[in-house]
Amino acid sequence: FCIISIEVQPRFDLWDQDWKVPLQYGFRQVFGENGGPGGLFHALRVTPPIIEICDNINTICPNAFVFNYSNPMQRVCQTVTTKYPKMKFIGLCHEIASMERQLPEIMETPFENIEYRAGGLNHFSILVEARYKDSRKDAYPIIRKKAHNYYKNYINDHEVQSQKPGGERGVFFELFNRYNYIPITTDSHLGEYIQWAYSVADHEAIMDFYNKYKNQCLTFYESKESYCNYFDLKKKPKERVVSIIEGILNDLNYEEAAVNLPNKGYIEHIPNNIVVEIPGIVNKDRVIGVKLENYPLDFSSLLINQASVIRLTTEAILEKSKSKALKALLADPVVDN
């Protein structure tokens, strides 16, 4: 097993450049990490060293399972799986964990009594279905009925410093109101892919999230403590990769909530081989995606807008082509200048 979780340093100085350089030319970004100009610059910076790691994996242990945590997840995974289509390369993201915290409160039942499936692109996914295990009752009507009041008052003290109710829900509510499905993430990520997002995003809450994340990272980087002292290794790990590795070693054939894999008809409206985020079945041989039946065509139209950007970014990196990088930027729906 190989786990990739890297950043090119100095992480936050470079991220500031991803924000400020486009701003000098009049371009405003919602977050600048995974989409738009910042997402492209980030991908061009971090993907080459990940490709180098995968070159070594392909030489030393070509049958290894490779798990990636590095952003921009979508573009990293697309580039690696294009160069190494036979590599067991799986992208993992933490956003799906929001469902484990929120659905039990909305549905008024323990998480163990909930079945759900979500999918789309990384950081651009929706809750597709949810039901109660005991009664098999469809829970989406209840979720839709309660969603506005619940999220309007939801305080995300898990990731932000302030206690502002309903923070980072501007783009979230626009998508829910228009498409009638619950996004599994918030404005900072959703807003990176949609051309009209800047005008409705909660920028104050986004900066609150960014500042807390930055402070946490810098505190850890600057700490002289060892990993063993900084983290409580006696606690049961919450990282989903642990459960996935257990599932592979024990051939459990269980369904994992979210993995990033090349599309093989898992979302029918998305071109094949574009990396999608979908549930996956974990066994000793591989992690295989689960087809999301009846995925809403209207929402997938937003996802399709990213397909050409993703492909051009991949080609730019693998071919080391400045021309392809510029074309990826020009194809991005959020680039309006």
Identify what each model region corresponds to.
Residues 42-49, 95, 236, 305:
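Soluble or luminal CAZymes and related metallo-dependent hydrolases
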Residues 1-6:
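N-terminal Rossmann-like NAD(P) cofactor-binding module of classical short-chain dehydrogenase/reductase
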Residues 55, 60, 65-134:
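Rossmann-fold dinucleotide-binding core
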Residues 13-84:
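Rossmann-fold NAD(P)-binding glycine/threonine-rich loop
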Residues 9:
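Active-site beta-alpha loop architecture of Rossmann-like, nucleotide-cofactor-dependent enzymes
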Residues 108-337:
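Long, compositionally biased stretches enriched for glycine and/or charged residues
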Residues 48, 52-55, 59, 78, ...:
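A broad, structural surface signal
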Residues 43, 89, 320:
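Flexible, glycine- and charge-enriched loops at secondary-structure boundaries
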